[in-house]
């Protein structure tokens, strides 16, 4: 839990592979091949420390949005991500309740994108810290809204709670009779709700819904009561989603 809260997976992985990539990029420069730095697209403007930090923050938030949608759309990834959504009582620690493999996959993609974009190590650490700080706040069990306009600029606890709502955050259309629920969900944005607005996944309703996963309530499915049982059951669901084992 503490490892996730501090973003240590991403930070350690970033600094672990940086020497290897520095060597590789050095070889490319020797061969006359340039390297890409996103903050260099407008010299004198985008390469300033604050401007580049803002650019990278927006880019990585978009990456987070895409990853978050994948966690819900792909059954094998949802099998792991469900650990995060299975907590019925939202708290600031809910953000840190994850399957370890889910965290590792997320970190690997983040670091891969960071290295491709050429972000400075100090800015990578800053973006990880900013993201973790606000994610913790968004999971707090408080009725906090930023108002009509503020909700469309920055993700609030109310906006994110709808993402955790039973039959809403993971399902675009709820189950009706014998008709199964349609996966899709709402409010995947991590810091910025812009992406949800752009891609039609935003829900700005002022409801304060119960949180969790539908089959916890309707079928009593067990997602684990402690860390080790959550990890074990997550791997079991993953194997089933990949067709490697049968449901029992």
What does each model-identified segment do?
Residues 197, 207-248:
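Cytosolic-facing loops and C-terminal tails of multi-pass membrane proteins
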Residues 2-211:
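Membrane-embedded catalytic scaffold of the fatty acid hydroxylase/desaturase
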């Amino acid at each position: 839990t503490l490892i996730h809260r501090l973003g240590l997976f991403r930070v350690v992985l970033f600094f672990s592979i940086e020497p290897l990539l520095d060597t590789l990029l050095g070889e490319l420069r020797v061969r006359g091949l340039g390297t890409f730095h996103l903050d260099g697209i407008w010299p004198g403007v985008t390469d300033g420390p604050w401007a580049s930090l803002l650019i990278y923050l927006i880019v990585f938030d978009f990456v987070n949005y895409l990853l978050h949608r994948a966690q819900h759309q792909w059954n094998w990834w949802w099998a792991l991500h469900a650990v995060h959504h299975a907590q019925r009582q939202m708290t600031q620690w809910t953000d840190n309740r994850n399957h370890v493999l889910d965290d590792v996959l997320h970190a690997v993609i983040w670091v891969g994108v960071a290295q491709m974009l050429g972000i400075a190590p100090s800015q990578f650490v800053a973006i990880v810290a900013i993201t973790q700080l606000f994610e913790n706040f968004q999971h707090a069990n408080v009725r906090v809204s930023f108002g009509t306009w503020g909700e469309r600029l920055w993700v609030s606890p109310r906006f994110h709670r709808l993402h955790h709502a039973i039959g809403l955050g993971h399902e675009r259309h709820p189950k009706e009779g014998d008709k199964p629920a349609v996966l899709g969900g709402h409010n995947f944005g991590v810091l910025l709700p812009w992406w949800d607005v752009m891609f039609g996944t935003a829900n700005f309703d002022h409801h304060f819904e119960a949180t969790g996963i539908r089959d916890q309530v309707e079928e009593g499915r067990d997602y684990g009561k402690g860390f080790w049982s959550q990890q074990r059951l997550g791997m079991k669901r993953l194997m089933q989603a990949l067709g490697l084992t049968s449901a029992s």
